[in-house]
Amino acid sequence: MQEALVKARDQIILNPDDLPGSWYNVLADLPGEFPRPKDPEDGPSRLEYLSRVLLKHCLQQEVSTERWIPIPSPVQDLYRQAGRPRPLYRARRLERFLGTPAKLYYKREDLSPTGSHKVNTALAQAYYAAEEGCAGVSTETGAGQWGTALAYAASLQGLKCIIFWVRSVYDWKPDRRALMQLYGGKVFASPSRETSVGRGILEKNPDHVGSLGIAVSEGLEYAEKNPGYAYCLGSVLNHVLIHQSIIGLETMKQFDMIDEKPDVMIGCLGGGSNFGGFILPFAGEVVKGKRECRFLAAQSASAPNLSKGEYKYDFGDHAEKTPLLKMYTLGH
């Protein structure tokens, strides 16, 4: 009996019916207004360009200041089919190893069908793409998690999925590539010969190892040049953070179940969707004075934009197809 009680407190599992019915948008609770995307001083309008290649539902969510955005019922069903709600585990052995009096918990986003949190927004974006009558979606991927997630989600909606994968990682991870292809994704090493951006780079350097910025440019160009395709992005933007809030909303319910309140929340941070999805529902309550909690982001030393980047307007891709976005940047 005692062992069962300990297990119940160490594996905090929500029922499928406890899945949150709405996503959370932290913009509703932040003081002031964030700097808006803007066009550069010369050249064509990037803001107008994005309106042609991004999904309409996602663009609406991108600028929304509504606190709660209902999760469409079919997306809720897809979340449940993909294993949501995800468990929260207590790390007792790590506590003993560290000799700490702290209680340590970790959220199991790794239990998704593709192994990461990326599925949370991929399922939503693929659903919206199907609702808007798209034939397919295009995107980029770095480590490969986002490309895999979108290929999986697109397959559930009967959509084609074109993925431009940073060449150095494409060559490094053939098994991950095979998984994308298993879900029906068509994967190109980036820079590729499928786009003018890629061809231009390869003409100058046939052995170019690629970058995420180049892959973003290729994904955007593919959606622009191929009717019926929309471009999907797996991190960075507001609508992605909204979809990922499902992580933090579940986590908040799970801590309520065991009458605990986290005082420190730690997450890895690349583009920010994992960290943001995890902490923003809690951060919104901190802003409103309803809770006390510290938030720590752990970032790779190879891309330390938060600690070494400059906070300024910059493009989000190599070919300067995106609007100028206010960010901590090491350059595009």
Place the predicted regions along the sequence by residue:
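Positively charged, low-complexity intrinsically disordered leader regions
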Residues: Q2-C134
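Active-site/ligand-binding loops adjacent to catalytic centers
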Residues: I71, P85, I201-H239, I247, ...
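Short coil/turn connectors at secondary-structure junctions
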Residues: T100-A102, G133-A135, Q157-C161, L182-G185, ...
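General beta-strand structural signal in soluble alpha/beta enzymes
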Residues: L104-R108, S138-T139, F188-S190, Y231-S235, ...
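A glycine-rich, Thr/Ser-enriched phosphate-binding loop motif common to dinucleotide/cofactor-binding enzymes
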Residues: P113-A124, S235-E250
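A short, small-residue-rich loop immediately preceding and capping a beta-strand
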Residues: T121, A129-S168, K261-F275, F295-L296
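Active-site-proximal loop->helix
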Residues: W146-V209, L306-H318
